[in-house]
Amino acid sequence: MIVLRSRSPRRKYVLESLDLDFRIEPEDIDESSLKNEHPLEYLKRICLSKLGTRSKDEFLISCDTIVVQENSILQKPKNFLEAVEMLERLSGKTHKVASGLGIYYKGLERFAFEFSQVHFRSWNHKQIREYVEKYSPFDKAGSYGVQDKEGPVRSFDGSYTNILGFPIRTFFQYHEFWKKYLKGN
């Protein structure tokens, strides 16, 4: 059985849509960034840390998603004001989303990631506040969800599931590790 080290309902949804046999056992870690830490170094450190306690008999996966604008990491907002500030910073601009995948299987540890580009609508302060009030994006990097119908995303280049928080193309590269966990096998 696959062990997903995440509480994200979006990651759970992606694995369910693949019809995989898995259970959820999140690992609580400190997700603070280190001083002068490059976004991809941060992503790798967090993904591998989330793998947590390891047993050779388990197939563990962890993910983390970051929004990167002007080489700065935008994580999950801590409160309403921070969510509004992030969205104002992103409004009318293009930024990158990186989702990382940590894998532990039979003593092997792997890390890989995907980048996507997201193009935001130009929103005024009122539109941003209304969005935050309606969607409460406090569990999402960058303070938004690509899946939100009335959200700030105008368009994107790359993988929808990557922006959602699960780098599915990268996950498929490791299919030899997880294909035996497909339901019905």
Swiss-Prot record:
Keyword hit for Signal: no
EC number(s) recorded for this UniProt protein: 3.6.1.9
Database matches in Pfam families: Maf
GO cellular component terms, A-Z: cytoplasm
Keyword set includes rRNA-binding: no
Coarse class of the protein's main subcellular location: cytoplasm
Localization per record: Cytoplasm
Listed cofactors: a divalent metal cation
Reactions catalysed according to its record: dTTP + H2O = dTMP + diphosphate + H(+); UTP + H2O = UMP + diphosphate + H(+)
Site annotation Important for substrate specificity: residues: 10, 65, 147
UniProt-listed GO biological process terms: nucleotide metabolic process
Coiled coil: none
Enzyme class of the recorded protein, top EC level: hydrolase
Keywords: Cytoplasm, Hydrolase, Nucleotide metabolism
GO MF: dTTP diphosphatase activity; UTP diphosphatase activity
Active site (catalytic residues): 64
Role played: Nucleoside triphosphate pyrophosphatase that hydrolyzes dTTP and UTP. May have a dual role in cell division arrest and in preventing the incorporation of modified nucleotides into cellular nucleic acids.
NCBIfam families per UniProt: maf
Family: Belongs to the Maf family. YhdE subfamily.
Name of the protein in its database record: dTTP/UTP pyrophosphatase
The organism of origin for this protein: Leptospira borgpetersenii serovar Hardjo-bovis (strain JB197)
